[in-house]
Amino acid sequence: MKNITDSFLCLSYWPSAGSFGFDTDILATNLINLSVVLGVLVFFGKGVLTDLLDNRKQRILRTIRNSEELREGAVEQLEKARARLRKIEMEADRFRLNGYSEIEREKLNLINSIYTTLEQFENYKNETINFEQQKAINQVQQRVLQQALQGALGTLNSCLNNELHLRTIGANIGMFGAMKEKNN
């Protein structure tokens, strides 16, 4: 390495008139040396620079394509999600309406059932009252009839003879049988 540096230093000490050499002082270099160096850099660096730019361009295009594909996939998923959301909202509305109508239907059924039960209780109450009234009337009639019969028997026994007594008893038994048939 020292030999290469020494050779460049030797070249810089040579007189510039009539010879060709490298001038290491950048401010003192002439335009021709700069153009030669730039020409060499452009000639040899052009391929490297073109490859770098092409690679960068390909990466950018690949990234753009991937981004577009991801965007399209995201848009597709978003549309599917929106469609699912609309479907679920429609089902929720349908269930809500069905639920409300079912609740109203059950409410009406319950009200009708309670009304029917109350009517049955009212009918049972009225039947029970009528039965008890009829029972009380029958008991009063039987008691009145027994008392009347006892009073009549007492009166007959005291005032009638045996033959008249038997005829009166037969007539009363006939009347009692007719009353009993009438009540049943």
Swiss-Prot record:
It comes from the Eukaryota. Keywords: ATP synthesis, CF(0), Chloroplast, Hydrogen ion transport, Ion transport, Membrane, Plastid, Thylakoid, Transmembrane, Transmembrane helix, Transport. It is a single-pass membrane protein. Its main location: plastid. The chain crosses the membrane at residues 27-49. The keyword Ion transport applies. InterPro entries: ATP_synth_b/b'su_bac/chlpt (IPR002146). In plastids the F-type ATPase is also known as CF(1)CF(0). HAMAP family: ATP_synth_b_bprime. This is ATP synthase subunit b, chloroplastic. The gene is atpF.
